[in-house]
Swiss-Prot record:
Cellular compartments per GO CC: host cell cytoplasm; host cell nucleus
UniProt name for this protein: Phosphoprotein
Nuclear localization signal 1, short sequence motif: residues: 29-36
Gene: P/X
PTM comment: Phosphorylated by host PKC epsilon and casein kinase II.
Species in which this protein is naturally found: Borna disease virus (strain V)
UniProt-listed GO biological process terms: exit of virus from host cell nucleus through nuclear pore; symbiont-mediated suppression of host cytoplasmic pattern recognition receptor signaling pathway via inhibition of TBK1 activity; symbiont-mediated suppression of host toll-like receptor signaling pathway
Miscellaneous notes: The P/X gene has two overlapping open reading frames. One encodes the P protein and the other the X protein. The P (p24), X and P'(p16) proteins are produced by ribosomal leaky scanning.
Functional summary from the UniProt entry: Essential component of the RNA polymerase transcription and replication complex. Acts as a scaffold which brings L in close proximity to the N-RNA complex. Plays a role in the segregation of the viral genome in host daughter cells during mitosis by interacting with host HMGB1, a host chromatin-remodeling DNA architectural protein, thereby stabilizing RNP on chromosomes. Interacts with host TBK1 and thus interferes with activation of cellular antiviral state. Inhibits cellular histone acetyltransferase activities.
Amino acid sequence: MATRPSSLVDSLEDEEDPQTLRRERPGSPRPRKVPRNALTQPVDQLLKDLRKNPSMISDPDQRTGREQLSNDELIKKLVTELAENSMIEAEEVRGTLGDISARIEAGFESLSALQVETIQTAQRCDHSDSIRILGENIKILDRSMKTMMETMKLMMEKVDLLYASTAVGTSAPMLPSHPAPPRIYPQLPSAPTTDEWDIIP
């Protein structure tokens, strides 16, 4: 006759469930050596190498085949996302550079137009300086003409005086080419004579 266990707990403690067994792993995983050329090669080349061999940044010795496969798939997805993000960033950078080049070109065009306008303004300023100098020369010439006219008037007065002095002793009439200068002071009235007085005797 089979003996019954004293309790159900004893029977459960004696048996071991295979599902609860845990795999023992080494406490300190071995560090993965990164290839030296991975630190010096360009980013694009590194992304290509990671797509081909994702295990270059993982340690397959520490995982089972299924874990390593899932890890490789995750690395591939990550590399793909990084590549897509880098392509998007490259497109954004190209667009930004295109906008900057367009702005620089527009700035150069406006600068050239400003230079042309500045040259034209400078030329107009040169003409205005020439006109100003010509006006000053005309003023100087006008003053010289006035001085010459005054000199001619003085010469005519001297000629009249000479003609008058030579014509005093002769009967030749004197030609008044120049009128006599006006009196400085007005002529005072003369005193009345005794004949002009109206005296009642």
